[in-house]
Amino acid sequence: MKVLVAMDEFNGIISSYQANRYVEEAVASQIEHADIVQVPLFNGRHELMDSVFLWQSGNKYRVKAHDADMNDVEAMYGQTDSGMTVIEGNLFLNGEKPIDQRSSYGLGEVLKAALDNQAKHIVISLGGIGSFDAGAGMLQALGAKFYDDEANIVDVSEGAYKIKYIRRIDLSDVHPQLANAKLQLMSDFSSRLYGKQSEIMQTYQTFQLNQSEAAEIDNLVWYFSELFKSELKLAIGPIAVSYTHLRAHETGRN
C-alpha cells in the first residue's frame, strides 16, 4: 500500500516535518510493508529551507549579517545542486525597535553573499520578517545609494522613517549579478504593497501600533514606490502578495 503523508505544521508546537514523522510511524506500526512518502509543507514563513533540503541535496552557507535592529547576527542561506538558492528571512531578520526604526539591510547582505556565490535562481521567504521599509535597506546593502534634496546620502539602514528624506535614487553600483538573477518571493500573508489592504494596515495592532502610526509607515512605502517609478521611469502595476502552501519538491522544478 502506498501512503502519502503531507501534514501542515501545528503552529508553535511541532513542525510539518515532525508531524509527518509521527504519522509515518503510526502508519508503519499498523500497516506492514506500507510504502510511505513524506511531503513537508511550508507557507512562506516557516521551514522553507528544511523542506527544500529534505528533497534536494546541496549546501548551506553561514554569513555575517544584521537583524532588523542592525545588530550583528549569523545568517544562513542554502544552494541546491539543481541551482536554486533559498533565503529564509524570518530566521535572522527580526527586531525589537519601533517598526519605523527597523531595516531590511541584513536581507541585502545575505542576498549579496548569494550573488557573490553565483546564485541565479533565488527564492526568498518574507513571512515573519521584522522590517517594513519597502526593501530600502536591502537595496542599500546591495549597493544602492539614496540622496536627500541637498545631495546628502540618506542612510536607510537606520529604518523606514529615513525614506521620507529621499529625493534621488542611484542604482549604478548595485550588485551586477542582480540583473541576471531570477527572484521568487514567498509570503504567508495576502496583502497589497500599500493601501488599506497592505500588511501593516491589516496587522498593526499586533505590533502595538495605532492606525495613524501604521498609516505613516504605509505612506512611506507608497512614497518609496512612487519615487522608484518616477526616478527610474518604471511602469509598475498593483502589487499583491497571496498566501499559499507549496510542496517542497515542487519548488525545485524548472
Per-region residue spans from a language model:
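Single conserved hydrophobic/aromatic residue that forms the stacking wall/gate
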Residues: 245-248, 252-254
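Non-transmembrane, aqueous-exposed alpha-helical and coiled segments at domain scale
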Residues: 24, 34, 157-160
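Glycine/serine-rich anion-binding loops at beta->alpha junctions
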Residues: 9-16, 100, 119-139, 238-242
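Extreme N-terminal starter segment of soluble prokaryotic enzymes
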Residues: 1-3
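Carboxylate- and glycine-rich phosphate/diphosphate-binding segment that chelates Mg2+/Mn2+
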Residues: 99, 183-243
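Glycine-rich nucleotide/cofactor/substrate-binding loop typically near the N-terminus or early
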Residues: 26-95, 183-191
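Glycine/threonine-rich beta-strand-loop-alpha-helix active-site module
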Residues: 105, 109-112, 119-125, 130-181
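Anion-binding (especially nucleotide phosphate/pyrophosphate-binding) glycine-rich loop
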Residues: 72-131
